[in-house]
Amino acid sequence: MEIKNLIDEDFCNYKKPAMFIGMPKCSFKCDKECGERVCQNSELATAPNIEIDNPGEIVIRYFQNPITEAVVFGGLEPFDSYEDLTQLLSLFACGSQSNYAQTKGMPDIVIYTGYEPEEIMEKLAPYGVLTSFGGDFIIKFGRFIPRRHHKFDELLGVELASDNQYAMRLEDLL
């Protein structure tokens, strides 16, 4: 498995302290649709990938950290690394039931995507089972559009880069 970055304690992408996992692939749909380079993660795209031999170690790191309450998957585009994203989500669900979880339980899961729900609904459907493990499962939808106003999202508790972007709970989509 490869990722772009791993931040054990991130306080910028969600209202709760979170582990941030940057996924390594993107089709750059935001750039293509507006006809200019607008990717907020363009520097990250050129950074080397980080090879993860044992993804379970990421899960253990999360559960051993007393500060974090959520896991955020972000840029590049998590759904362009669907198999790895699914593997990590499954590991977090299993980890929430293990001795590593101690009293933490299932973290809130947040996925930042540039896709719209109708573009990835077939990928979202299998994740429905994960909502039974506890914690919120939130997805931020919408491509970045330059020269649009920023918008505060109540569900995420953060300001989003353009006003067409929004977050929804997975259970409200399925």
Region spans (language model):
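Canonical radical SAM enzyme core domain
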Residues: 42-60, 79-128
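Extreme N-terminal starter segment of soluble prokaryotic enzymes
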Residues: 1-3, 107
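Charged phosphate-binding loop/patch that engages nucleotide di/tri-phosphates or the phosphate backbone
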Residues: 164-174
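Structural recognition of alpha->loop->beta junctions
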Residues: 122-148
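A cross-family glycoside hydrolase active-site/sugar-binding cleft signature
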Residues: 22, 74, 110-114, 142
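Conserved glycine-rich "GG(E/T)P / GGGxP" loop and the immediately following alpha-helix
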Residues: 67-97, 142-161, 171
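Canonical Radical SAM [4Fe-4S] cluster-binding loop centered on the CxxxCxxC motif
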Residues: 4-53
